[in-house]
A protein has these predicted regions:
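Conserved beta-strand positions in the Rossmann-like core of class I SAM-dependent methyltransferases
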Residues: 29
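Active-site substrate-recognition segment that forms the wall
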Residues: 6, 13-24, 33, 41-48, ...
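Dinucleotide-binding Rossmann-like beta1-alpha1 core, especially the glycine-rich loop
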Residues: 46-124, 129
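Helical element adjacent to the flavin cofactor pocket in flavoenzyme catalytic cores
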Residues: 133-187, 191-192, 196
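Conserved dinucleotide-binding and phosphotransfer motif residues
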Residues: 24-26, 153
């Protein structure tokens, strides 16, 4: 029986997994290479919580919609509520308006409705030149406080400066080698971003995307969070957060003046009335980090078979999947590839993993687990003939 679980990664993916599992009675050890939680893409000071909507027909099976509702419910819990500022979010209409969102949407006039530019301006406290979708329950999370609260669960032990160097299966347990020593676990959850010396995720494709936010000294009497492709938050701790750049395959995390300028230009283009209110960029702060995405932009969450990639090289592609021997390995799970949506989506990923560990039915449609299945890319490559090599070609 699973008693002790090691989670690698102390960003929102790992911290939410740890909390959900600890809440179900497991002892959880979280290992992270950094000296504090949220050192990667989860470490921006504020994280915006809002959904990207789809039409009424697709909503019941839409990951982001379901994740948004689930996250809002969790954030009402007292220990989390203090880290959530429910400012509401105005999603400004773009040139390509959201035709799918209208009175037929199941959330209409309850969780979302449309405001004309005058009403949107009154809601925001600043002049806006276009209509917007209004999400009254949305807002932003103060990330540091939330991560620390998640990791403070009585069943969670967080170990920092613990870079994981490898993991091997020994009978029914994992033995994890880190710079803070060895750890044994009945199950292992990998929830770290990007590359690692652990080979257990070979075949799971991730792409880095650099993003830089700008922190602007308080200058705007903004009451709500504005989204327009980028975003602008009300002042918090003396700064507005403006974000964010999007630079695929850029691995550097230095703060760049041109990225500040990009954020300023996007803000001025979408909210012209605020352009002249911005303080000089010399007063701006910033943070750059890497967000990791999958090819289909859905995260990977659930059980992963690290032997699958090699096993499929022995089988030519065909319509139906081959029957493979069950790997003699302890359980391995992943929660990775959340991109910029981790603070909304990671909770659902954590629940999916916990449900698989405990063999508990999921409250969400079966299609969600299939959409997030980590091994979907390996099977896809096999079906497309990218894995199999005839024996004579192997020498």
């Amino acid at each position: 029986m699973t008693q002790h679980i090691v989670v690698v990664g102390a960003g929102i993916a790992g911290a939410s997994c740890a909390w959900v599992l600890a809440n179900r009675g497991y002892r959880v050890t979280v290992l992270d290479a950094a000296s504090q939680p949220g050192s990667g893409g989860s470490g921006n000071p504020l994280a915006i919580i809002y959904p990207k909507l789809v039409n009424a027909e697709l909503t019941p099976n839409h990951l982001q919609s379901l994740a948004y509702l689930h996250t809002l419910a969790l954030l009402q819990q007292p220990q989390f509520a203090e880290h959530f500022q429910q400012t509401g979010v105005l999603w400004l209409d773009q040139d390509r308006s959201l035709q799918d969102v209208d009175a037929t949407h199941p959330w209409w006039q309850e969780k979302v409705w449309r405001l004309d530019s005058k009403a949107a301006s009154e809601q925001a406290g600043v002049a806006l030149n276009r209509s917007a979708l209004w999400f009254p329950e949305a807002g932003f999370i103060r990330t540091d406080g939330l991560l620390r609260t998640l990791l403070a669960h009585e069943n969670v032990r967080a170990v920092f400066n613990a870079r994981v160097c490898g993991a091997e299966a020994l009978k029914s347990q994992w033995r994890i080698n880190s710079t803070q020593g060895y750890f044994s676990a009945d199950a292992l959850v990998l929830a770290y971003a990007g590359s690692s010396s652990i080979s257990l995720t070979d075949g799971l494709p991730l792409r880095p995307v650099r993003g830089q936010i700008s922190q602007i000294p308080t200058a705007i009497p903004l009451r709500t969070t504005l989204c327009y492709g980028g975003y602008l938050t009300p002042s918090d701790s003396g700064y507005h957060c403006v974000g964010a750049t999007f630079s695929p395959m850029d691995l550097q995390t230095d703060i760049r003046d041109q990225d500040h300028q990009f954020n300023a230009n996007e803000l001025g283009k979408n909210i012209p009335a605020l352009a002249e209110s911005l303080p000089l960029q010399v007063t701006w702060l910033g943070r750059a980090s890497l967000r990791w995405q999958t090819p289909d932009f859905s995260p990977m969450a659930g059980r992963h078979d690290p032997s699958l990639l090699n096993a499929l090289t022995e089988h030519p592609p065909r319509k139906h999947r081959p029957e493979l021997a069950t790997p003699d390995l302890p359980p391995l799970y992943v929660s990775i590839g959340h991109g910029a949506k981790g603070y909304t989506q990671a909770w659902v990923a954590a629940e999916i993993i916990a449900n698989e560990i405990t063999n508990t039915p999921s409250p969400w449609p079966e299609s969600i687990a299939k959409q997030l299945a980590p091994d979907r890319f390996i099977w896809r490559d096999w079906q497309r003939g990218r894995l199999w090599t005839p024996r004579r070609a192997r020498g």
